[in-house]
Amino acid sequence: VLFRSEGELTAVYSVGDTQYGKDDTPAIIQRMLNAIDDSVAHHIFLSSKYKIGQIALPQLGDCIEGMTSQKGKVMGRHDIGVSEQTRVGRRVLLAQIKAMAQLASKVIVPVVPGNHDEVQRFLVQHANDSWALEVAAAVADICVENEFLKDRVEFRFPATDDLTLAVDLSGTLYGMAHGHQSSNLIKWWT
């Protein structure tokens, strides 16, 4: 364990639009690993000043490039296939969780789907038929089997057909939605 603080506050480290598989996956992975290292360092700094007992790692959609956007034309720029994109997504999310779980007594991983994560678009489907949710669900299964993580990490998913999620983080309601849902945010929020 690097450093674990106890307290009432929640630190939030959000991730979205990684789009593994888009053009240069090795560079995207490296940026994410660097961001994880930076988050650990920043959290240690914050914990020296504030009583942070919980960490939230919101996953805000588009973890993979997928094959549905632009009527499938995005596949022409893939450097890895969809199954490998989800594999990368699982491995990076697990790395993030393992790094941050050493720093707090509780880690919450709320997840919402994005548009690139859609499994398909040619039939009407449930909104939660999403590669982003599948990546997180697979990592949740791994965490349940891990002695260190099983009681420390909690995943939160939207209800069937919901694209949004709200979670209570230390008394603050934290709402999440992927940005593809609105072209006019002011109108969308009202």
How should each PLM-predicted stretch be described?
Residues 18-25:
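Short acidic, Gly/Ser-rich segments with clustered Asp/Glu that frequently serve as metal-coordination loops
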Residues 6-11, 15, 29-142:
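Core catalytic region of metal-dependent phosphoesterases/phosphodiesterases
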Residues 98-110, 119-123, 129-190:
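His/acidic metal-ligating clusters that form di-metal
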